């Protein structure tokens, strides 16, 4: 399927079109976890659109799926979103060859762009090794590429976790259009990234508290992917409003809304502590907060991080504190909203 841009036009296209907030979308499964739940996935795409987000990032690496299932998941997301919002895909498969196959699949089914990183087991031997492998993958596709520095074994090259001398070189690759700063990294890394390559590509810090600096001072125009649906609903799209107000220069109004969300940010804080050291980003806490605010929910296959009761209670308490009512019943989350409406329930086993 034809892209909206040519490879040589990708940077110019992104500057004009990548604006607003991007959120991740995770796979949904049938209650027995045997198949993808296409209706549930489409429900989430439509709920993301109703919230006012401008892009959805399909995250097929977040749980156990075959490679063909991952491709099918991407195809469903792209098809449902087509012509309404941008679609991206987190491309961090097991091998470079799989990454290239996924990039070609995204281009074939009509995805907008790709967020390209490396699998958590990737072990570069040198700084040049990182660059050459990355360029090799970018050269294989016409897709616009967002460079993702997270989850790499690169602290041995620089204490910022990524060798800064590579940023301008990667930004010079023709179809690299943006860089995503890893969530939870130092603000110094964000400033360094803007200073080194924002004259060539977009720089994207997904952390909301930093937007009050990065938008007015550095010109950030697009943020994510982040689970911003965990703090808003279509009726009260507060995260979208914060970013839009900052883009308009109305910082005081944006700050007022930001402080309204303080209790939710405090309640959700620390949910990532149990999995950051593994390199595996669990889908369950994000799927749970999305379900609480109207998403499909549904549990996912192993391997994935555990969703503890205390985490769910922190999410629900945070939502109540900012005037939102978490969805009930809890059983609906585990089988998925669409399946629950069809009569699906958790199985009970008796000896």
Where are the language model's segments positioned?
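Residue-level recognition of short, well-ordered coil/turn positions
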Residues: 52-53, 111, 175, 250-251, ...
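General structural feature for long, well-ordered alpha-helical segments within catalytic domains
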Residues: 40, 44, 69, 73, ...
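Structured C-terminal cap/extension of enzyme domains
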Residues: 213-351
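Active-site beta->alpha loop and helix N-cap motifs at the rims of alpha/beta catalytic domains
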Residues: 2-161, 303-306, 325-350
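Generic structural signal for residues positioned in beta-strands
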Residues: 20-22, 202, 285
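Catalytic alpha/beta core domains of metabolic enzymes, predominantly
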Residues: 136-144, 149-271, 275
């Amino acid at each position: 399927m034809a892209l909206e841009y040519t490879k040589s036009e990708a940077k110019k296209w992104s500057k004009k079109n990548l604006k607003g907030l991007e959120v991740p979308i995770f796979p949904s499964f049938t209650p027995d976890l045997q198949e993808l739940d296409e209706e549930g996935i489409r429900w989430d795409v439509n709920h993301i659109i109703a919230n006012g987000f401008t892009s959805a990032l399909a995250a097929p690496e977040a749980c156990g799926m075959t490679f063909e299932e991952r491709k099918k998941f991407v195809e469903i997301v792209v098809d449902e979103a087509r012509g309404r919002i941008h679609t991206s895909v987190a491309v961090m498969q097991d091998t470079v060859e799989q990454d290239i196959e996924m990039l070609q699949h995204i281009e074939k089914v009509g995805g907008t762009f790709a967020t390209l990183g490396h699998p958590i087991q990737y072990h570069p031997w040198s700084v040049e090794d990182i660059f050459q492998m990355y360029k090799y993958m970018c050269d294989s596709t016409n897709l616009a590429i967002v460079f993702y520095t997270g989850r790499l074994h690169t602290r041995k090259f620089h204490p910022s976790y990524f060798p800064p001398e590579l940023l301008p070189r990667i930004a010079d690759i023709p179809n690299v259009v943006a860089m995503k700063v890893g969530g939870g990294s130092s603000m110094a890394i964000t400033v360094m990234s803007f200073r080194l390559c924002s004259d060539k590509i977009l720089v994207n810090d997904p952390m909301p508290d930093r937007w009050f600096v990065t938008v007015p001072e550095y010109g950030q125009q697009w943020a994510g992917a982040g689970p911003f649906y965990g703090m808003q609903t279509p009726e009260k799209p507060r995260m979208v409003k914060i970013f839009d107000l900052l883009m308009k220069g109305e910082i005081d109004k944006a700050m007022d809304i930001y402080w309204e969300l303080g209790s939710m940010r405090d309640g959700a804080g620390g949910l990532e502590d149990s999995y950051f050291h593994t390199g595996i980003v669990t889908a369950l806490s994000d799927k749970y907060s999305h379900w609480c605010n109207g998403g499909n929910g549904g549990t996912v296959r192993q391997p994935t991080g555990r969703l503890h009761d205390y985490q769910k209670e922190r999410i629900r308490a945070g939502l109540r504190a900012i005037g939102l009512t978490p969805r009930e019943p809890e059983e609906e989350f585990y089988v998925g909203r669409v399946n629950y409406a069809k009569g699906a329930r958790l199985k009970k086993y008796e000896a």
